[in-house]
Amino acid sequence: ADLAHRQQSVNRLLYKIYSPISSAYAELKQLSTDNXD
């Protein structure tokens, strides 16, 4: 149970880190697509 709890904490931390990065990346991709048009 302790291992599962730790895994959950790690997942939450990774999500906190990667969520803004991936959304910013999506915005950049959208911008470059608009630019090429």
Swiss-Prot record:
Q: Does the keyword Transport apply?
A: yes
**Name the UniProt record assigns to this protein:** Hemocyanin subunit B
Listed GO biological process terms: oxygen transport
Give each disulfide bond as a residue pair.
none
Q: Which family does it belong to?
A: Belongs to the tyrosinase family. Hemocyanin subfamily.
Its annotated function is as follows: Hemocyanins are copper-containing oxygen carriers occurring freely dissolved in the hemolymph of many mollusks and arthropods.
Please give the tissue specificity annotation from the record for this chain. Answer: Hemolymph.
Name where it's found. Secreted, Extracellular space
Provide one Gene Ontology cellular component.
extracellular region
Question: Which GO MF terms does the UniProt record name?
Answer: oxygen carrier activity
The transmembrane segments are none
Task: Look up keyword Cytoplasm and say if it applies.
Answer: no
Which keywords does this Swiss-Prot/TrEMBL entry list?
Copper, Oxygen transport, Secreted, Transport
Top-rank taxon = Eukaryota
